A protein has these predicted regions:
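Surface-exposed loop/turn motifs in large extracellular/passenger domains
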Residues: 1-8, 22-31, 47-54, 68-76, ...
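A cross-taxa feature marking solvent-exposed loop/turn segments within ectodomains of secreted
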Residues: 5, 15, 28, 38, ...
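Short glycine/acidic-rich loop motifs that flank beta-strands on beta-rich extracellular proteins
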Residues: 16-24, 39-46, 62-69, 84-91, ...
Length: 312
């Protein structure tokens, strides 16, 4: 191991492997390097804790950043652009801090956290123009719990903005998620369900499909502005039982403002202005749904309930 090393003000390009590799070394600082046109990752790290990676320019590699089995890592103020695969792929690493980075023009997922990257805090990043029309999420969580996505700009990515799969107790707060090529935010299940995730105080607008699509259980969707999406504003799929939709402002989404296909959903205190919407609130094949204290204006219909029981 090489603990407490500093790698600063270098240029590494056109290698047959990675630009910089840190392995089994703690308390390393990687600062203000240019890592470009390398065959694998620009920056690669494994089994190293308390590493700071800041102010680097990482571009035109096969992929940008890889972190595995490394806890308490800070990725700060890096420019990660123009990669054929991932922008940043992080796995099995706890308490990550990912702050004020720019991630653009990755063909694969721009920022992918997987396999127990719990307790991450991701804030004030710009994630733009990534993916293609079939794949490549701007932000992707898989098997990640108790992490926070806060005040990021997720804009004009060709696929979905934020996708959370088999992940629980995460918070998506105060982000701008706009003009993405599929969903704004999507919560999915896999072999286990996603549960107890919170989507709060975000602006989700002008996405090509649904603004927020939820398959997770016990999801809270609170105080978001969801507007001008080309399909539904919010859709809760049949797996998304016990979702709460509270205090949101839904404006002119082109499908239904809110579509519910799950049981035990609460829809309350939302403002729905649906001049471009089909139905303000549609409930299909769902039982024990509560709809209360909402303000609805416009749309072809106010509330539509079909094949459903036990309403309040």
């Amino acid at each position: 191991s090489s603990d407490r090393a500093i790698v600063r003000n270098n240029s590494f390009s056109s290698s047959g492997d990675n630009g910089i590799k840190v392995a089994s070394s703690d308390d390393v600082i990687v600062d203000n390097n240019t890592l470009s046109s390398n065959t694998d990752y620009g920056f690669y790290m494994s089994s190293s804790d308390d590493v700071t990676v800041k102010s680097n320019t990482i571009s035109d590699n096969n992929a940008g950043v890889y972190v595995s089995g490394s806890d308490d890592i800070l990725l700060f103020n890096n420019s990660v652009n123009d990669h054929d695969s991932y922008g940043a792929y992080l796995t099995d690493s706890k308490r990550l801090k990912i702050k004020q980075n720019e991630i653009k023009n990755s063909v694969g997922d721009a920022l992918y956290l997987s396999s127990n990257c719990d307790l991450a805090f991701i804030d004030n990043n710009t994630i733009k123009n990534n993916g293609n029309s079939d794949s490549g999420r701007a932000v992707r969580f898989f098997e990640v719990d108790e992490s926070t996505l806060y005040n990021n700009t997720i804009d004009s990515n060709d696929y979905s903005g934020v996708v959370i799969t088999q992940s629980s107790k995460n918070k998506i707060i105060k982000n701008t998620i706009k003009s993405n090529g599929k969903y704004g935010i999507q919560i999915l299940n896999d072999s286990t369900k996603s549960a107890n995730n919170t989507i709060k105080d975000n602006v989700v607008n002008d996405n090509t499909n649904i603004g927020i699509l939820n398959h997770g259980i016990f999801t809270t969707i609170l105080n978001n502005t969801i507007k001008y999406n080309e399909n539904d504003g919010i859709k809760v799929a049949s797996a998304g039982a016990r979702t709460t939709i509270d205090g949101n402002n839904l404006i002119d989404n082109e499908g239904n403002a809110v579509s519910i296909l799950a049981n035990n959903v609460i829809i309350k205190s939302n403002i729905i202005d649906g001049d471009s919407s089909k139905v303000a609130v549609v409930v299909l094949d769902s039982n024990s749904v509560i709809i209360e204290n909402n303000t609805v204006e416009g749309g072809l219909q106010g509330i539509k309930i079909q094949n459903s029981l036990y309403f309040e």
